[in-house]
């Protein structure tokens, strides 16, 4: 016999967390539950014969054990509460290093190992029926509506696996059969990922669910491969071609770091004049290079009469988590277009976060090899490094400023 106990979304729920020892935070619902659901903790209370709601239980627990006479409403307003905690001495004496080394030694000498992970958007698959999350491009691969086997360029070339761009600009790739943990998964899309360690492959959990709406039944179920941190894996190329829904096919900045992606080191930021690490852009006007203020299409706007709101993003801390993209989608009622339209460059995200890899071919190297300015030079610049540095560039529509 099976029972279904529907629970609300976490944004419809009460809860608390201990961020670290002595630091507590409260979770409160942002909206009233949309459907006739009951929070899991309320269900537990009901099953134990209690008529108390989880909100009442949570508040009583905080007032008794956490707040120490302080105001519940203030803690709720502030979002966090700190209590005194004794320092704890941490030692490694209880870690059985010998057993860990023995486990590694017995892992085998397979050429390949597989790791499973969860994506930033879809997570473990509990929200796989949410089209916002399905359409959200992965911050690194920039691909949506899919999971896939990530493989390094070196291993892909050895196995004859390829990704290629077709005439309409969309990305295609080979399929592979994957065997690990005693399980074989057939026809898994293979995506060549810069920075993937040779000898390793990985695949995201949360996809391949069969109890969803038709358009949400995408990807392959990788849970049978999960069991431990390490699995030997065998991979063989399969017949057929997979069509990816990838929103970014230009993966390197191609020598335009100072024009499009402005970055510098902390040392240069502190010690060098701003003109050296933040060059002012120049434009051509009447056959002369002029600064931006000379070519503005609009008359200056007097913003002294009131507040002028602005948005600044600290690129040093942006990890492309994509929470802003989903928030923008929700706030502005942006439609979801589906995998096919994403594939043919018709995504409707108002906000995107481009991802750029570093390339081994730089201007300096091109000049040293005597190919700077040639077709070979520009072709080499399009190839990411096997162990690239990664930069993120948020690109917003005018509503954000």
Residue ranges of each PLM-predicted region?
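Stable alpha-helical elements in mature extracytoplasmic
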Residues: 40-43, 393, 401
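Short Gly/Pro-enriched turn/cap motifs at secondary-structure boundaries
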Residues: 35, 139-140, 385-388, 397
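A cross-kingdom feature strongest in bacterial/archaeal respiratory oxidoreductases
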Residues: 1-34, 62-351, 361-362
């Amino acid at each position: 016999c099976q029972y279904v106990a529907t629970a609300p979304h976490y944004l419809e729920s009460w809860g608390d967390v201990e961020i670290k020892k002595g630091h507590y935070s409260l979770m409160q619902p942002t909206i009233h539950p949309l459907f006739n659901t009951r929070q899991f903790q309320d269900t537990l209370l009901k099953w134990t014969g209690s008529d108390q709601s989880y909100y009442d239980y949570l508040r009583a627990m905080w007032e008794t054990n956490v707040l120490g006479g302080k105001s519940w409403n203030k803690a709720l307003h502030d979002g966090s509460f700190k209590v005194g905690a004794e320092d704890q001495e941490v030692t490694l004496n209880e870690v059985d290093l010998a057993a860990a080394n023995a486990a590694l030694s017995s892992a085998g000498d397979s050429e390949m190992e597989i790791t499973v992970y969860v994506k930033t958007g879809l997570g473990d698959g509990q929200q796989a029926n949410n089209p916002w999350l399905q359409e959200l491009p992965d911050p690194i691969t920039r691909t949506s509506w899919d999971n896939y086997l990530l493989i390094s360029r070196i291993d892909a070339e050895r196995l004859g696996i390829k990704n290629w761009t077709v005439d309409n600009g969309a990305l295609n790739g080979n399929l592979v059969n994957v065997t690990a943990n005693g399980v074989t998964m057939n026809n898994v899309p293979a995506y060549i990922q810069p920075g993937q360690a040779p000898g390793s492959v990985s695949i995201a959990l949360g996809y391949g669910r069969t109890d969803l709406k038709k358009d949400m039944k995408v990807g392959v179920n990788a849970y049978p491969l999960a069991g431990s941190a390490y699995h030997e894996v065998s991979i063989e190329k399969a017949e057929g071609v997979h069509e990816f829904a990838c929103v970014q096919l230009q993966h390197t900045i191609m020598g335009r770091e100072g024009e499009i992606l402005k970055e510098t080191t902390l040392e240069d930021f502190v010690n060098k004049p701003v003109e050296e690490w933040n060059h002012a852009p120049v434009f051509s006007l009447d056959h002369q290079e002029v600064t931006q203020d000379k070519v503005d299409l609009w008359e200056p706007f007097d913003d002294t009469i009131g507040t002028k709101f602005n948005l600044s993003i600290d690129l040093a801390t942006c990890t492309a988590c994509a929470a802003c993209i989903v928030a923008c989608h929700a706030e502005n009622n942006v439609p979801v277009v589906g995998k096919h339209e994403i594939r043919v460059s018709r995504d409707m995200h108002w906000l995107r976060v481009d991802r750029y890899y570093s390339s081994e071919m730089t201007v300096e190297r091109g000049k040293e090899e005597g190919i700077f300015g040639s077709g070979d030079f520009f072709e080499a610049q399009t190839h990411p490094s096997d162990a690239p540095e990664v930069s993120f560039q948020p690109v917003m529509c005018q509503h954000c400023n």
